[in-house]
């Protein structure tokens, strides 16, 4: 995770009746500002913090496709069904759940023959499991069966976690910076008064993997604006 520096602004409100003069005015008498502090006014520190978090793809799909042609519907259906059942059995042996796969079939007639095409689509979250399944299918099935290369992507759960994580990291970075600033000013950092995410972006974070296999990643950035109240250190000490 890469974190960029925060921009910090501290506002220490003056006490009632404090007078500020413009030093640029001749004799300092030309411009006078009087600030009246109300009962509800408070000392504050305002911080803009940012963070960046990257996350690789957490899902991949692999498709297994094949077709056959026969003179009768029963023959082509039985041929395709046997192959589909073998593939499903292999997937079950490797603990692939039923909700993680779909099977589609399509039959049509051309040139006095019946043609059937089948496609088995599998979603993997365990990439080691995916590799083992692909090796078995490539070894056991003939060349008429096509096993695709994995297509990696980010699930909605992964993207949601990424967005929350980068925002929390930006807020934490802002809090640490505000704590350092308040300590430097001789104050104690109080409760947050305002937290606002000002900017959130996502971009392609590059690809991981060897030649032919690319596992993409996404980089998310967040910039937040946070206001904390400041307390005098003396007020935090217990009276003896």
From Swiss-Prot:
Q: Which residues form a coiled coil?
A: none
Q: Provide this UniProt record's keywords sorted from A to Z.
A: Cytoplasm, Nucleus
**Keyword Cell membrane appears in the UniProt entry:** no
Q: Which domain of life is it from?
A: Eukaryota
Q: Does the keyword Ribosomal protein apply?
A: no
Q: Which GO terms describe its biological process?
A: immune response; positive regulation of canonical NF-kappaB signal transduction
In terms of Pfam families, this protein maps to: SIMPL
Q: Which GO terms describe its cellular component?
A: cytoplasm; nucleus
Q: Which family does it belong to?
A: Belongs to the IRAK1BP1 family.
The name on file for this protein is: Interleukin-1 receptor-associated kinase 1-binding protein 1 homolog
Source organism of the structure: Oncorhynchus mykiss
């Amino acid at each position: 995770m890469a974190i960029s520096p925060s921009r910090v602004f501290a506002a220490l409100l003056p006490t009632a009746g404090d007078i500020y003069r413009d030093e640029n005015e001749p004799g300092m008498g030309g411009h006078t500002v009087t600030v009246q502090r109300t009962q509800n006014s408070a000392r504050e520190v305002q911080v803009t913090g940012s963070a960046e978090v990257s996350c690789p793809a957490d899902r991949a799909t692999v498709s297994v496709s094949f077709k056959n042609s026969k003179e009768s519907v029963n023959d082509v259906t039985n041929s395709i069904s046997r192959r589909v059942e073998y593939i499903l059995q292999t997937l079950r042996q490797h603990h692939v759940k039923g909700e993680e796969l779909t099977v589609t079939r399509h039959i049509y007639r051309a040139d006095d023959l019946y043609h059937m095409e089948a496609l088995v689509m599998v979603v993997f979250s365990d990439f080691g499991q995916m590799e083992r399944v692909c090796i078995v299918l490539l070894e056991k099935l003939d060349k008429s069966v096509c096993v695709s290369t994995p297509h990696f992507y980010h699930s909605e759960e992964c993207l949601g976690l990424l967005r929350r994580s980068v925002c929390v990291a930006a807020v934490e970075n802002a809090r640490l910076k505000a704590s350092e600033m308040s300590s430097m000013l001789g104050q104690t950092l109080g409760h947050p008064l305002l937290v606002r995410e000002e900017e959130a972006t996502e971009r392609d974070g590059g690809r991981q993997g060897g030649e032919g296999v690319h596992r993409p990643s996404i980089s998310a950035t967040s910039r937040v604006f946070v206001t904390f109240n400041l307390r005098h250190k003396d007020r935090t000490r217990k009276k003896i």
